[in-house]
């Protein structure tokens, strides 16, 4: 699956 940019804010 295409993973979105993981941005843990």
UniProtKB/Swiss-Prot annotation:
GO terms for cellular component: mitochondrial inner membrane. It is a single-pass membrane protein. Pathway: Energy metabolism; oxidative phosphorylation. One of its GO terms (biological process) is oxidative phosphorylation. Keywords: Membrane, Mitochondrion, Mitochondrion inner membrane, Oxidoreductase, Transmembrane, Transmembrane helix. It is found in: Mitochondrion inner membrane. Its main location: mitochondrion. One of its GO terms (molecular function) is oxidoreductase activity. Component of the cytochrome c oxidase (complex IV, CIV), a multisubunit enzyme composed of 14 subunits. The complex is composed of a catalytic core of 3 subunits MT-CO1, MT-CO2 and MT-CO3, encoded in the mitochondrial DNA, and 11 supernumerary subunits COX4I, COX5A, COX5B, COX6A, COX6B, COX6C, COX7A, COX7B, COX7C, COX8 and NDUFA4, which are encoded in the nuclear genome. Belongs to the cytochrome c oxidase subunit 6A family. Component of the cytochrome c oxidase, the last enzyme in the mitochondrial electron transport chain which drives oxidative phosphorylation. The respiratory chain contains 3 multisubunit complexes succinate dehydrogenase (complex II, CII), ubiquinol-cytochrome c oxidoreductase (cytochrome b-c1 complex, complex III, CIII) and cytochrome c oxidase (complex IV, CIV), that cooperate to transfer electrons derived from NADH and succinate to molecular oxygen, creating an electrochemical gradient over the inner membrane that drives transmembrane transport and the ATP synthase. This is Cytochrome c oxidase subunit 6A, mitochondrial. It comes from Thunnus obesus.
């Amino acid at each position: 699956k295409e993973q979105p940019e993981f941005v843990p804010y």
